[in-house]
């Protein structure tokens, strides 16, 4: 099996329409380059990411990974290919941040903690300033 580079798209669960469009475009480009997308799996941002991912012509059934805070897989975004219900609540931010690279779009304290973990793991971090 060939390893696929995993890029986490993180940020506030609820972003505005400009942020949604940005996330969709980023996600589509990530999949077109042959990478996977990791998110927290809940809210508007992951839904936009997965919509963008699925719009890529080369999208497969293993391109989107949702790392959920709870034990229940049901709340995951419907476009999720791989759902990992961790039961770790906010501590699952460590798992998300252990991706190969991080793209932050908006966000608050939770996003900041994911960025801090990514920094500790020496992962590349890209930040986009949008309301969220």
For each of these PLM feature ranges, what is it?
Residues 2-17, 26-28, 32-33:
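Generic N-terminal amphipathic, Lys/Arg-enriched alpha-helix
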Residues 20-21:
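A conserved mid-protein helix/loop that constitutes part of the nucleotide-sugar donor-binding site
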Residues 24-31, 40-121, 127-131:
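Acidic/glycine-enriched connector segments
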């Amino acid at each position: 099996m060939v390893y696929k580079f995993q890029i986490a798209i993180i940020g506030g669960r609820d972003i505005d329409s400009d942020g949604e469009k940005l996330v969709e475009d980023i996600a589509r480009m990530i999949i077109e380059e042959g990478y996977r997308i990791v998110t927290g799996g809940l809210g508007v941002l992951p839904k936009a990411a997965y919509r963008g991912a699925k719009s890529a012509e080369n999208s497969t059934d293993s391109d989107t990974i949702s790392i959920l805070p709870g034990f229940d897989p049901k709340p995951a975004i419907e476009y999720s290919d791989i759902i990992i219900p961790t039961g770790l609540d906010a501590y699952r931010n460590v798992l998300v941040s252990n991706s190969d690279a991080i793209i932050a779009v908006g966000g608050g304290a939770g996003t900041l903690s994911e960025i801090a973990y990514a920094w500790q793991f020496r992962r590349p971090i890209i930040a986009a300033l949008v309301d969220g």
